[in-house]
A protein has these predicted regions:
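Terminal, non-globular segments
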Residues: 1-224
Length: 224
């Protein structure tokens, strides 16, 4: 088990522990997404690899649709502005449709849909940045207690780095570099590491906020 796998499992366990305290409650599907991630990584992918070489991408491609749909739903719930919600719905239809077309007609399911996935990444980067902008407009904002902020931070870092990585991979000249595979591997690990760290912090902030709330109520009862 590598370091990235450990952070992945830690994020999932943190989600299970903090599940009842997660606020806003519409963020709870992230815990189920992490459960599917763990099952995919440790059961589905190993089975597909043992079945036939190259079949592991089937698992990653199917999972990517679940992942994209989940995050589109979450960002839709996060944003209440009609124009942003319209953008999210349009972006979801375009990126999911493009992904299916790329996998079914332009490539095949044994290859990763890198082109369409980059479209999805640009949308997520924009939505995360828009949330940061909304936070900056406030006079005061408790970042640690804002689970949405940390989730957006994780999405922003993950997809920004992966977008750069996938763009470089599509450049034929990039592979002429001796260290290309090493750089690709390092960038991917950094992106995933940042993603799971931020998700874990989001769960910790939910749990800690609930702890402080309970503690404050106990004091109020004590001093009555």
């Amino acid at each position: 088990m590598n370091l990235i796998s450990i952070f992945e499992i830690v994020a999932f366990i943190a989600g299970l522990i903090a599940y009842k305290t997660i606020k806003p409650t519409f963020l709870k599907p992230i815990v189920f997404l992490l459960a599917i991630t763990v099952l995919n990584e440790y059961l589905v992918i190993p089975y597909l690899v043992s079945f036939k070489k190259g079949f592991n991408n089937y698992g990653y491609n199917v999972f990517s649709f679940i992942d994209m749909a989940t995050w589109f739903y979450l960002f839709y719930k996060i944003n209440t502005k009609p124009s942003i919600r319209y953008f999210i719905i349009t972006g979801a239809i375009v990126s999911l449709s493009y992904s299916f077309i790329e996998l079914t007609f332009l490539k095949d399911w044994r290859q990763l849909h890198t082109d369409s996935f980059r479209v999805y990444e640009l949308i997520i980067i924009f939505l995360s940045t828009y949330y940061f902008y909304q936070v900056m407009l406030k006079q005061y904002h408790n970042i640690f207690g804002d689970s949405i902020f940390w989730l957006c931070a994780g999405c922003f870092l993950l997809h920004l780095i992966l977008f750069i990585n996938l763009t470089m991979l599509n450049n034929g000249q990039y592979w002429n570099l001796k260290s290309s595979s090493f750089v690709q591997h390092i960038l991917q690990n950094i992106a995933i590491f940042c993603y799971y760290c931020c998700i874990t912090i989001a769960f910790v902030s939910c749990y800690y906020s609930k702890y402080l709330e309970t503690k404050q109520k106990s004091r109020q009862v004590l001093y009555k």
